[in-house]
Amino acid sequence: MKKQVECERLRLMVFESAFDLGNDIDHLLLKRYGYDDQKYTFIIPIKENFFEDGHLKVEIEETVRGKDLFLLTDIGNYSLTYNMHGFTNHTSPNDLMMQLKDGIGACNSHAKYINVVMPLLYAGRQHRRISRENLMCGMILRELDQNRKMKSFITFDAHDQGVEHSIHNMEFDNFFATNIILENLIHDVDCSTLENLVFVAPDNGATGRRNVYLNSFNSSFIHREAGSFVTHRDYNHFVDGKYPILSHDYCGNEDLKGLLFVITGS
């Protein structure tokens, strides 16, 4: 069994939903601080218990007193299963969000600082109120913000950066993948193809990143207004001889209008 790094204050609480991500980060940290990754680890051991009645409990098996704790969870990971009343259920974002909150509570305020790393922002599309509905994303962030030990919340490609307005104490770090996508396009696609790109935004959700691509490649674009009564259009005259790239913000359900935005070109 690996030993905890003793002379460093940093610790990782890695839930099973983010197991691979946590191991990669642990390996990089050990390499950075000069520890043998075969003997040491920054990951504290925990038990994740799902009970037959649907309740859950997180148990921490090592002390976190005075530590800078980073909790890693992937609420979009539905591959995990648990048994409830004789049925096998896949974990939902709600299950994993409650597990995260239980893990924070298990720290018992002993950690010096608590940081949350959540690649997919929970309820990220519920960022504004249109009718009689709940602002779940902002409510969760505000609830975490009220914990005096919370230092930062880290996510990637949030649907709307404006959700950070719901918090006042902890930091909200939102990292975009746009630059990485541009680097891979330049590296993997030949120059003649890059000159003939056309970027497509099926609704208003991805117009921001689409504009970054347009400015980078000086390309043309196609945009379908959200809520348009026209579902199918013929865009062949726009993409004839071009290489279309569909830029969308989120594929959350089978009914998504953007999935009906299909381009075919000769």
What are these regions (language model features)?
Residues M1-S266:
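PRPP-associated nucleotide enzymes
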